[in-house]
A protein has these predicted regions:
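Glycosyltransferase-associated regions of secretory-pathway enzymes
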Residues: 1-128, 159-275
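A generic hydrophobic-helix recognition signal that picks specific residues
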Residues: 120, 138, 155-157
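Solvent-exposed aromatic/hydrophobic patches embedded in short alpha-helical segments
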Residues: 125-140, 147-153
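Single-residue recognition of alpha-helix boundary sites
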Residues: 138-141, 173-175
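Short beta-strand-to-loop acidic/aromatic patch adjacent to the donor-nucleotide binding site
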Residues: 140-148, 157-164
Length: 275
């Protein structure tokens, strides 16, 4: 009967969300959830919405993502055709056989990129549906009928935050010059784009659509590295000849009122959850 969101001393994710909702009372705070919830858990979600007017539980089942889908069989057949169109000496026969096997293994009723991630239930599942949600952006709330007194248009933007990102004060107006920004981690002087924060100023941002296009063409595409990072690189015409750290500086979401990635200082709650 508890709210099914991790809330431990080391990883107070639910508390972080409630704190954000309390500070940002004029913003809608969506919690995008998926899973087979017990009736008591759904009741607990409803009570959370009642206690905090701007918190909205958005169930994955209530959102139609079909416009972003593609048949798995089409992805595999396109890659098979690509291999078979090559001169024999350049074909990867091991890959070709693997693609044909994967094609033959697709079960009836599961010929869908989106459904394949529903069967995954790992990090890929999280990453993929995060991308889908950010393509919808503010439209998520409208489609789930979770707007309340708040004013949203169909092309409203959205900020995604991992639950270990702590809002300390009101964020105020947020200016994203190129319409998209993401979290950037820096380790030993090397920067890398991360999906712990994704901010867009509208739905269907072309950088995320570019990532979706990669997901629709690569048989082994990854929702994080391809769906986000490579999509952003493609949209902004990033070249490997350019300085990657400088590109990360350009695309980074920066804000003084957010403490970033606090779970890096604790044992991973995800690792404990799946072990």
């Amino acid at each position: 009967n508890d709210i099914p969101i991790i809330n431990t001393e080391k990883n107070p994710y639910l508390n972080n969300i409630i704190k954000a909702a309390t500070i940002e009372k004029e913003r809608l705070i969506g919690i995008f959830v998926d899973g087979d919830f017990f009736p008591g858990q759904k009741d607990a979600f409803s009570k959370l919405e009642y206690d905090y007017e701007n918190i909205k539980i958005i169930y994955r089942n209530d959102i139609d993502f079909s416009i972003y889908d593609k048949k798995l069989s089409e992805i595999y057949m396109e890659n098979i055709s690509k291999q078979e169109s090559m001169p024999e000496e350049k074909r990867d026969y091991h890959l070709l056989q693997l693609l044909k096997k994967e094609l033959s293994d697709i079960q009836e009723g599961n010929d869908s990129l989106i459904k394949s991630y529903l069967l995954d239930k790992g990090h890929g599942w999280f990453d993929f549906y995060r991308n889908m949600a950010m393509l919808k952006a503010g439209q998520l709330f409208l489609e789930a009928d979770k707007v309340g007194r708040y004013d949203l248009s169909t092309n409203s933007g959205c900020i995604y935050l991992d639950a270990d990102m702590i809002i300390t004060e009101k964020l105020g107006g947020i200016y994203i010059p190129d319409g998209i920004a993401v979290h950037v981690e820096r380790i030993d002087g090397r920067a890398s784009m991360e999906n712990g924060i994704i901010a867009v100023d509208r739905n269907n941002h072309p950088a995320l659509l570019a990532g979706l296009e990669i997901m629709h063409t690569k048989f082994d595409a990854d929702p994080y590295s391809d769906g986000v990072c490579n999509g952003i690189r493609k949209h902004f015409n990033y070249s490997l000849n350019e300085n990657y750290n400088s590109f990360c500086d350009f695309i980074e979401f920066k804000h003084d009122n957010i403490i970033m990635n606090t779970s890096q200082f604790t044992q991973s709650s995800w690792a404990r959850h799946v072990s």
